[in-house]
From Swiss-Prot:
Transmembrane segments: 14-34, 39-59, 158-178, 197-217
Organism phylogeny: Bacteria, Bacillati, Bacillota, Bacilli, Lactobacillales
Top enzyme category: hydrolase
Its EC number(s): 3.4.24.-
Gene3D superfamilies per the UniProt record, alphabetical: Metalloproteases ('zincins'), catalytic domain
GO terms, molecular function: metalloendopeptidase activity; zinc ion binding
Listed InterPro entries: HtpX_protease (IPR050083), Pept_M48_protease_HtpX (IPR022919), Peptidase_M48 (IPR001915)
Cellular localization per UniProt: Cell membrane
Protein name: Protease HtpX homolog
Cofactor requirement: Zn(2+)
């Protein structure tokens, strides 16, 4: 059951990534059709822009992410229990030992960053070290180490980059339509044809709806990787109850006092903002109740 769930989550993630590239290509084709006189040219342009966005974001240093979240690196002497748990989980996962950081915040939480295991780091708040016992903390750190082993940070970064590229291209297309109009001219043979009108409408719909669709796909990818990391943590610790207890404590916690931007919020094991209302629809994390239910059925 455990390995079936892990395999299923991986398949869903790759299907969502394929959908992401398809969405980017569709938007590129729409822009190419309207302004470049070539749908293929638009697709190539969109893919190049997406690749540039992803490349820049992937190579953002671990130190920058940690600084943005107010984390400081600690030694084995400063935080022996946390350090040894990270060391143990990394050994079981067969990855290099990540660097260990602490965030001074009373709200329990943790996150990992790094585009590959060789430059990865794990951070935990002072709050999580105070309220969790060793089994629960092992579940949390196992979750973060699983993100590193599964290259989740890289996958999530690609998803964020593609969503950003799609939003930028859609905004650019909207401004071009507003200030300069489309490529429609008397020289286009398909201008007044039924096919031309259909293609025009489809292109406009793609440009308008692409950012929303990109956001939804990005959120779906993030949620699938959270389920996968939960299951992978149990694979490492062989203790689903420890992970369940940790999640239940996280569910009862208060929002973090330290300001967390939207990009960093997706890295944490539990949503650090805990905003309500309609914003719940755009959470990067699945509901903890659903995560717990899946763990109980392993």
């Amino acid at each position: 059951m455990l390995f079936d769930q892990i395999a299923s989550n991986k398949r869903r993630t790759w299907l969502l990534l394929i959908a992401f590239f398809g969405l980017l290509a569709l938007l590129g084709a729409a822009i190419g059709y309207l302004w470049l006189r070539s749908a293929v040219g638009g697709v190539l342009l969109a893919l190049i822009i997406g690749a540039i966005y992803a490349g820049v974001m992937i190579f953002q240093s671990t130190e920058v992410v940690m600084a943005m979240n107010g984390a400081r690196e600690v030694s084995e002497q400063e935080a022996p229990e946390l350090y040894h748990i990270v060391q143990d989980m990394a050994m079981v996962a067969q990855i290099p030992m990540p660097r260990v950081y602490i965030v001074e915040d009373p709200s329990p939480n943790a996150f990992a960053t790094g585009s590959k295991p060789e430059n990865a780091a794990v951070a935990a708040t002072t709050g999580i070290l105070q309220i969790m016992n060793r089994e629960e903390l092992e579940g949390v750190i196992g979750h973060e180490v699983s993100h590193i082993r599964n290259y989740d940070i890289r996958i999530s970064t690609i998803a964020v980059a593609l969503a950003s590229a799609i939003t930028m291209l859609s905004s650019l297309a909207g401004r071009m339509m507003w200030f300069g109009g489309g490529r429609r001219s008397s020289n286009d043979r398909d201008n007044d044809s039924g096919l031309g009108i259909i293609l025009l409408i489809v292109s406009l719909i793609a440009i308008v709806l692409a950012p929303l669709a990109a956001t939804l796909v990005q959120l779906a990818i993030s949620r699938q990787r959270e389920f996968l990391a939960d299951a992978s943590s149990v694979e490492l610790t062989r203790n689903p109850q420890g992970m369940i207890n940790a999640l239940l404590k996280l569910d009862r916690s208060e929002p973090m006092e330290h300001h967390v931007d939207d990009a960093s919020a997706a890295l944490y094991i539990s949503d650090p903002k805990k905003e309500g209302g309609l914003k719940k629809l755009f959470y990067t994390h699945p509901p903890i109740s659903e995560r717990v239910e899946r763990l109980r059925h392993m």
